Design a protein with these regions (language model features):
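Histidine/acidic residue-rich metal-binding segments in metalloenzymes
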Residues: 1-5, 28-42
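Alpha-helix initiation and N-capping motif
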Residues: 8, 30-31, 70-71
Length: 188
């Protein structure tokens, strides 16, 4: 990872199992997982794309742009205001202290995490991840859900992202899910 090139290496393709725990990844090499990249100080936003070779798109990228124009979309991607979705069109709003996903922020006090999800089916689980480990999870069982969580154990320098898992499955048994781009937080 070279921070000099961070503005062009802002997105990473999200496979359904790229971010799994216990060292079980698509590549079988934990050094190549996004979690390892982030733990080593890497900065990237998460996008979804497909490589099914069958013409059946499943993964998508949601972009939080101020308007529906090419310049606004590319500006949002450069600032990592995007997230990956697999199968369903899940709407995900993840913020810390009112700052959007993709931002690097300095705060006083503890991070106030806010997650709003609008799913297309029941939300099985919302997972807040800090520095590669689960910080908080909620099993709402409804299509729409909100999480407000204060990270009392904040150490002063962390990254956070959110995973959303829906109850529905595709024809291969894969659940619809979404990954927010991270937010990097430091104490002032």
């Amino acid at each position: 990872y070279d921070p000099a090139y961070a503005s062009v290496i802002v997105n990473t393709e999200m496979w359904p199992d790229t971010m799994q725990y216990e060292g079980k990844t698509y590549t079988g090499n934990t050094e190549k997982t996004l979690r390892e990249f982030l733990n080593k100080g890497g900065r990237t936003g998460f996008v979804g794309s497909t490589d099914t070779h069958e013409g059946k798109p499943a993964a998508k990228t949601a972009v939080l742009a101020g308007e529906l124009t090419r310049p606004a979309i590319f500006e949002a991607l450069r600032h990592r205001r995007n997230y990956a979705v697999f199968n369903a069109k899940i709407v995900l709003d993840f913020r810390i202290n009112s700052h959007f996903m993709g931002e690097e922020i300095e705060i006083q006090g503890k991070p106030q995490i806010s997650v709003n999800v609008q799913g297309t089916d029941k939300i099985e689980e919302i997972i807040v991840v800090r520095d590669g480990t689960v910080l908080h999870s909620l099993q709402p069982g409804t299509p729409n859900a909100k999480v407000d969580y204060l990270d009392e154990a904040f150490s002063g320098n962390s990254y956070y992202y959110v995973r959303v898992i829906q109850a529905d499955k595709d024809e291969h048994g894969n659940r619809s899910h979404a990954w927010s781009s991270p937010i990097w937080v430091k104490n002032k």
